[in-house]
Amino acid sequence: MIMKKILYILAAAICLLTSCEKQLKFPEKLYGDWYCHSTSLTSTDVHVYVTFNADSFTLYQKIGDGAYRVYSGTYTLTPGADGLYILSGEYSDGTPWGAEYAVLSSSNDTMVLTAGDVTETYTRVTGGIPEDVKNSAAPVKSAGDAGKAADGAEGLRFL
């Protein structure tokens, strides 16, 4: 009788554990496709998509009325002070990101990055980055090719 109760309790516990939504931990939480829907970097209309893989990224950005441009490179995610993670990286042309970002908060669906007085908020893209964005993006070979924003910012790159 006691053994039967233990088996029922064990079976119920297994069902409960397998039915819960898995909460990803860093760095796995970062992996995937993201869209930047809010930035304090510029007043210009921007559209930024980024894919984070295990140690590399691909970034698609459109500033103002311009075309999408695609950048790629590598990144690192390291534990920082106060339990925050620090996100930094380098473009494929060897240029480091404009700043290191503190990951202020992150869930499976939202991520807030900050560097100094710049804050960017990303939401996870379900279904991947739109194909029209990928297909229309011009590859950028160097920082000099990064383009010019409508507000005059030269070589503006997100991240």
Language model features with spans:
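Contiguous, well-ordered beta-strand patches that form the walls/edges
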Residues: 40-45, 58-117
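Sec-dependent signal peptide recognition
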Residues: 4-10
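N-terminal hydrophobic targeting signals that begin at the initiator methionine
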Residues: 1-4, 21
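Conserved beta-hairpin
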Residues: 47-57
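Low-complexity, Ser/Thr/Pro-rich intrinsically disordered segments found in N-terminal tails, propeptides
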Residues: 32-35, 50, 111, 127-128
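C-terminal motif of bacterial Sec signal peptides marking the signal peptidase cleavage site
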Residues: 16-19
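N-terminal helix-cap/turn-to-beta initiation motif at the start of protein domains
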Residues: 21-35
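Edge beta-strand at a domain terminus
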Residues: 71-80, 114-159
